[in-house]
């Protein structure tokens, strides 16, 4: 996405954390849920860190193939209802070749405004995410900002996450984003997932995107994901493959690992 991204693996040493943060700098919302562009209405538990990592992925647009490696999102649980999110990815053109660029970098705050089905309570879960978009190393050199609203509802048959957001892009254009994520039953070890979204960068271009994939929930603090995405951006086709993992660990002794919900499984 171009204004909101920015989906929770865990690192084991402070050196790994610093390395991931260095990687965290196109415009997109703070995606905090792999392998989607949107996110869910849940946050990391207080005192814990979640890491969303794509070791390698690829996209193809206008006859050019780009390696996306790595793509990193770090989620720090600040309190029961709030987390800090840092993200970024490295893009390297392969054909034709070109210099690598640090893109989609940003820093965000995400908060649960209403606890609901994702927190093992009744009704929808409602959250917001807002923050700053950092300049790209090879692209737009300005700063931007984004604001996103999220509503999630879980049933026995599956889960739906609705996203609506607005942004000021790095080149200072207005941007809106509307998306929906659908997941299979949370009790399934491997659940099918899908996402559709529409994004409009005013006076520039609009994007219609669809993704299908699967999430393998190994445990509460470890999952693997894969997704295939097809989009039309400014009249041009974009094809992308995503594969990664999400893991987590406590930043202090004695904490349990997971999100402030009944887990995504």
Where are the regions a protein language model picked out?
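Cleavable N-terminal export/targeting peptides
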Residues: 1-35, 252-265
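Transmembrane beta-barrel domains of Gram-negative outer membranes and organellar outer membranes
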Residues: 30-265
């Amino acid at each position: 996405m171009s204004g909101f991204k920015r989906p929770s693996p865990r690192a084991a040493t402070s050196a790994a954390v610093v390395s991931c943060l260095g990687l965290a700098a196109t415009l997109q919302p703070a995606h905090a849920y792999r392998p989607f562009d949107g996110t869910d209405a849940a946050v990391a538990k207080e005192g814990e860190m979640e890491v969303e990592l794509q070791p390698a992925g690829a996209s193809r647009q206008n006859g050019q193939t780009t390696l996306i490696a790595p793509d990193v999102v770090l989620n720090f649980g600040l309190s029961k209802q709030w987390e800090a999110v840092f993200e970024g990815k490295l893009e390297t053109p392969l054909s034709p070749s070109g210099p690598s660029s640090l893109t989609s970098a940003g820093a965000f705050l995400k908060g649960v405004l209403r606890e609901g089905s994702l927190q093992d309570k009744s009704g929808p879960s409602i959250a917001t995410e807002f923050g700053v978009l950092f300049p790209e190393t090879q692209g737009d050199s300005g700063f931007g900002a984004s604001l996103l609203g999220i509503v999630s509802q879980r049933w026995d048959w599956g889960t739906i996450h609705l996203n609506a957001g607005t942004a000021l892009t790095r080149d200072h254009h207005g941007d809106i984003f509307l998306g929906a994520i659908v997941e299979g039953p949370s009790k399934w070890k491997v659940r099918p997932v899908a996402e559709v979204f529409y994004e409009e960068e005013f006076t520039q271009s609009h994007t219609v995107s669809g993704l299908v994939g699967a999430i393998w929930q190994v445990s509460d603090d470890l999952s693997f994901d894969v997704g295939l995405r097809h989009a039309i951006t400014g009249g041009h086709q974009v094809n992308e493959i995503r594969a990664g993992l999400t893991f987590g660990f406590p930043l202090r002794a004695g904490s349990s690992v997971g999100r402030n919900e009944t887990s995504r499984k």
